[in-house]
Amino acid sequence: EELHKLRRIWATQALNRFDVEAAIELARSPSPKARAGALRALYYDAPRTEGLLPVAESAVSDPSGQVRLWGVSLLAQLASPKTVPIALKAMDGIEADDFLDFAVWSICREHRDRWADEMKEKGKNPFANLSQLLFASSAIGERLGADRILASLSDGKIKDDQTVWDIANWMANEGSPAHLSKLLGLATETKSVTRQHAYMNALLTAKKLRKINPSGTDRIASFLNSENDTIFGVAAQLAGLWKVESSRPALEKILNDDRASPVRSKAVLQALISLGGEKTNSYLNQLFGDPKTPYGRKAMVVTGQSKAQPILAARRAVKLLQGAPGGKDKFGIYAAFLGNRGATRALATEISQANLPEPIALQGLQLAESSPTRPKELIAAIQKAGGLKPMKMSLSLSEMA
């Protein structure tokens, strides 16, 4: 019966005799399909119809995502200054929905003048909560309220860690260098590992995606003393990407320590490679050439350099493979070169001019043959260096018998 009512409403609309009252009544139907259909009908006549704001406001809190979507669509056709604050309620208490998110995102942009200008003038959040402000500000690509939000963080007014992460992620995408500098300051002030991670992860994202640095980057060095591996790892990445030369001694000290965990050693190595320059090259040359440096640490240097310096790394890789303990590549040397086309070519060139023990050559051949790229040059070079015959890809009839 509800769907019959909906068809009658659509029929009156098609005949330019739209029954608005019937549509509003049907928008309160027990059937979600009928409610959504009624809102759709009201959407098309909204510019010529008064009193639809309460209908749309009720719809954006409906249990049905489809009804909420049409509620937001209806709001987009209305002239009320409250359309955006009402539309943002549609994302509360419901699972993530890309279509609904896009509809709310769009109305934040299309009705920007109804809320952004007021906020700039009054300096107050026009929405129900901070998350809504972050969403709306991201939609229009502006840093509205950023200073006020950072002040709230600094004053300890924001207690929820998830909200802190939301703010940090927003700053990563929208914040200015000055805002990022404040984030770094907040990271140094808090004792919460979760919040340190949130702030530092935002700084890392801003660097990688937007190439933006805060001021006072030397402050990151203090986190190289962190007992938390995650915090340490992000700090090491930032020290390298920000070119914080003052962190170099601390990084080298960790890499020189045989007791350092593989996780920290790898993070430090990548940081030093990111720092770059003659100092990094000299240090890594010394580390690789030192007879006291463990085989695993040398392998880490080679795999770490495979992308940045593939020719040098390939030359060193061959030396390590020739002396691999037990004739096995236990440290992923082959895999590191197979993951990069330029590095693969460099390794093929170096191996073609050398000899490899049969076990290590066989392992490399198996890895190269099973690689998605199946590099022919490397396969041929390994076969030659190890004195191996080409692997059979199929059996003859007699062999299958």
Predicted feature residues:
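Long, ordered, helix-rich scaffold segments
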Residues: 1-401
